[in-house]
Amino acid sequence: MKVTFDPAKRQTALSEKGLDFVDASIVFDGPTITVQDTRRDYGEARFQTVGFLADRMVMVVWTPRNEARHVISMRKCNDREKAIYQERFSQG
């Protein structure tokens, strides 16, 4: 799976959150839950994928661009999200 991103946003995520957009492909290759973000009109389809990076549950926000997933943001899930998604992962 090809992953693209804005280099400046990648650097911000690395500096502020310790997460590298390059690693989003690891998240996408594992078990995930993906939902479309329809809270507003972003001008393009936008998705939120929850998955795992090492032992951390993370959320990757992305949009399809050509044959790639273009990463917009990536962050660790908060406690509320962990509880919700852990239950969903447990259900299979």
Functional labels for PLM-detected ranges:
Residues 1-92:
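Ribonuclease/tRNase effector modules and their secretory precursors
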